[in-house]
Amino acid sequence: SDFICPHPEETTAYIVYLLGHMEKIAAVLGKSEDEKLYKKYAERAKLGYQKLVGTKKFSLDTDRQAKLVRPLYMRLLTEKQTTYAKNRLIKALDNYGWRLGTGFLSTPFILYVLEEMDTEFAYRLLENEQMPGWLFMPKTGADTVWESWEGPKAQGGVASLDHYSK
């Protein structure tokens, strides 16, 4: 929702991510000065991100899967932070019964992150038939992606039944 202000952790992560893409675009276009500038900005923002998640308020010690998946996928962390975030993600998944707990922005990343860690982790999440999860929908009769994990009954039948993919 546009009315919800993003958190500094999310905003900084996407700034680094987008600056990295801008750096690549500048390289393709042969704009070496712009490429250097975007790289410099991305490196500084990445350091800022690493400091931010080192604080208590934005700590990686969380069960919020998105907060762990995002920096792992975007490669925003130090080596020590990466090891911690991977271990913490597995703990978060264990705590949530290996059910999906990411939102729109991080769901596309989670299987890539898990597959890189161990293919079995990715399959374990993907093949979980409990709600919330990808296989819960077809198991309960869906042939499209629902807006709500619970399906049409969750909102009296008015929820989108052909929603942005989760």
Segments the model singles out, each with a brief description of its role:
Residues S1-K166:
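Active-site core of glycosidic bond-cleaving carbohydrate-active enzymes
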